């Protein structure tokens, strides 16, 4: 009900206007875009992908929730900047996809994942606190109930979301 606060959050998301210059903006959350070598999709590297996959999948959950709240009031942040938030969900989703036969397995290892971490597109990322030279395998395969937001949006709009769809189907 606070239109000033809502507008401030949307402007901050799009333009990084505010106190915390290193966080909150979509281009900081998704600093690099990569062509998916297996499809026509664009994958958006999450700023947390080099830290660990627990944080990367949390970013997907939080970004999806924020974009859905904005969408509910008529502001389509899923589509903003050529679907940058969707590209992030697809990147994180693809990297963390677990083979069907391994999905309910406790401890996951490299062979349990569909895609090899050594050949996965990644650009070294730095912020004021740290530098991540490679994509992290820590907590890879973290399961969070967030994929339905992205998949549902993309299905409604007729947009491809291969990896969000696979996660939504597995959940």
Predicted regions located by residue number:
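Long, well-ordered core segments of solenoidal/helical folds
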Residues: 3-41, 84-101
